[in-house]
Amino acid sequence: AGGTSGLYAFPRV
């Protein structure tokens, strides 16, 4: 999964 969530952002794995 990936995208933005609240104050966190992460790459799509």
Curated annotation (Swiss-Prot):
Stated family: Belongs to the periviscerokinin family.
Function: Mediates visceral muscle contractile activity (myotropic activity).
Tissues with expression: Dorsal ganglionic sheath of fused ventral nerve cord.
Keywords: Amidation, Neuropeptide, Secreted
Name used for this protein in its record: Periviscerokinin-1
Upper taxonomic lineage: Eukaryota, Metazoa, Ecdysozoa, Arthropoda, Hexapoda
Gene Ontology cellular-component annotations: extracellular region
Residue(s) carrying Valine amide: 13
Signal peptide as annotated in the record: none
Cellular localisation: Secreted
Originating organism: Musca domestica (House fly)
GO biological process: neuropeptide signaling pathway
Pfam families, sorted: Periviscerokin
